[in-house]
């Protein structure tokens, strides 16, 4: 996971102090890219422990098209609690946009189903894109999408994914984002009879919150360990059939967790 540590190091050295929506303040850069070869292991940060259960359940929650945190709470996941209303609703966030982007009236588009069909039928297409940035729905969302658009690319029997993330909390959020979209790439590749290729992570505003700087410096003192392997149940060929029990992470031996406050 050297690319992730290099990003953190770059922001600590070259980041600009900026104010932000939360009032916390950040060190920020604009424009950066990381690449991960998914054939070399599953890109899960090893210089601190990541909560893999949260990553898997959140992704399954997105893929369900769900926007209520009830499913997450039932599975012991609290990462969206701060933004939900009293009934657990978040508005038309990621799951809604991925699975039922509203066109007009009762019509909607299932972008996940559409892109999988494109990968299978027209793998050389340059239109294999999913967007969560629905301008007409932004004011209804509890939190505007941070990871806004991703595109797939097929070559030599391998599926790659590139994510554009407009806003990135490097210390807390980015390890989740890397793992989540890498896992989604593995899942879709399996459903399309392809091998995983690369995950490419492109950023707009990538930042370290000012109350995360000490934690970031601590993390940079730790030596990365070998990447784990994520095994998927090979019998699953439909993206909506995956369940938590269909994922097994092998050889994950991270350094201890590092706690940091969430900026809301």
UniProtKB/Swiss-Prot annotation:
SUPFAM superfamilies: Thymidylate synthase/dCMP hydroxymethylase (SSF55831)
GO molecular function, one term: thymidylate synthase activity
Pfam families for the chain: Thymidylat_synt (PF00303)
Binding site residues for (6R)-5,10-methylene-5,6,7,8-tetrahydrofolate: 51, 169, 263
Subcellular location as annotated: Cytoplasm
Residue ranges that the Swiss-Prot or TrEMBL entry lists as coiled coil: none
Binding site for dUMP: 21, 126-127, 166-169, 177, 207-209
Metabolic or biological pathway: Pyrimidine metabolism; dTTP biosynthesis
Gene Ontology cellular component annotations, sorted alphabetically: cytosol
Catalysed conversion reaction: dUMP + (6R)-5,10-methylene-5,6,7,8-tetrahydrofolate = 7,8-dihydrofolate + dTMP
Alphabetically ordered keywords of this record: Cytoplasm, Methyltransferase, Nucleotide biosynthesis, Transferase
InterPro entries in the record: Thymidate_synth/dCMP_Mease, Thymidate_synth/dCMP_Mease_dom, Thymidate_synth/dCMP_Mease_sf, Thymidylate_synthase, Thymidylate_synthase_AS
Enzyme class: transferase
Domain of life: Bacteria
CDD domains, per database record: TS_Pyrimidine_HMase
EC number: 2.1.1.45
Gene Ontology biological-process annotations: dTMP biosynthetic process; dTTP biosynthetic process; methylation
Active site residues of this protein: 146
Family per record: Belongs to the thymidylate synthase family. Bacterial-type ThyA subfamily.
Binding partners and assembly: Homodimer.
Function: Catalyzes the reductive methylation of 2'-deoxyuridine-5'-monophosphate (dUMP) to 2'-deoxythymidine-5'-monophosphate (dTMP) while utilizing 5,10-methylenetetrahydrofolate (mTHF) as the methyl donor and reductant in the reaction, yielding dihydrofolate (DHF) as a by-product. This enzymatic reaction provides an intracellular de novo source of dTMP, an essential precursor for DNA biosynthesis.
NCBIfam families in UniProt: PRK01827.1-3, PRK01827.1-5, thym_sym
Protein name: Thymidylate synthase
The species this protein was found in: Nitrosomonas eutropha (strain DSM 101675 / C91 / Nm57)
